Amino acid sequence: MSTYDQIEIEDMTFHPDSQMFTYPCPCGDRFQILLDDMFDGEAIAVCPSCSLMIDVIFEKEDLDEYYEEAGIAPPQPIAAAA
């Protein structure tokens, strides 16, 4: 899957109320990706108005500050049943 561009997480806008990162798309809309999806390993932000996607560059540890800004705790891993 090819992406339109690679964007650093610091260059995106974080919206604490929706826990979503956005970045301007050339079509006039915005690429979107949810904080929890990034925590789960997703790194592709999609524009809801066109077919473009961007690759978001981040380290999982970077997400802690955004959870703090949103006033929520990061998801806890689910323990496997023995």
Swiss-Prot record:
InterPro entries: DPH3/4-like, DPH_MB_dom, DPH_MB_sf. It catalyses: [3Fe-4S](1+)-[protein] + Fe(2+)-[Dph3] = [3Fe-4S](0)-[protein] + Fe(3+)-[Dph3]; 2 [3Fe-4S](0)-[protein] + 2 Fe(2+)-[Dph3] + NADH = 2 [4Fe-4S](1+)-[protein] + 2 [Dph3] + NAD(+) + H(+). GO terms for biological process: protein histidyl modification to diphthamide; tRNA wobble base 5-methoxycarbonylmethyl-2-thiouridinylation. One of its GO terms (cellular component) is nucleus. Residues 3-59 form the DPH-type MB domain. Its cofactor is Fe(2+). It is found in: Cytoplasm; Nucleus. GO terms for molecular function: 2-(3-amino-3-carboxypropyl)histidine synthase activity; ferrous iron binding; iron chaperone activity; oxidoreductase activity, acting on iron-sulfur proteins as donors; zinc ion binding. It holds the Pfam family Zn_ribbon_CSL. Keywords: Cytoplasm, Iron, Metal-binding, Nucleus, Oxidoreductase. Pathway: Protein modification; peptidyl-diphthamide biosynthesis. Component of the 2-(3-amino-3-carboxypropyl)histidine synthase complex composed of DPH1, DPH2, DPH3 and a NADH-dependent reductase, predominantly CBR1. PANTHER family: DIPHTHAMIDE BIOSYNTHESIS PROTEIN 3, DPH3 HOMOLOG-RELATED. Belongs to the DPH3 family. This is Diphthamide biosynthesis protein 3. It comes from Candida glabrata (strain ATCC 2001 / BCRC 20586 / JCM 3761 / NBRC 0622 / NRRL Y-65 / CBS 138) (Yeast).
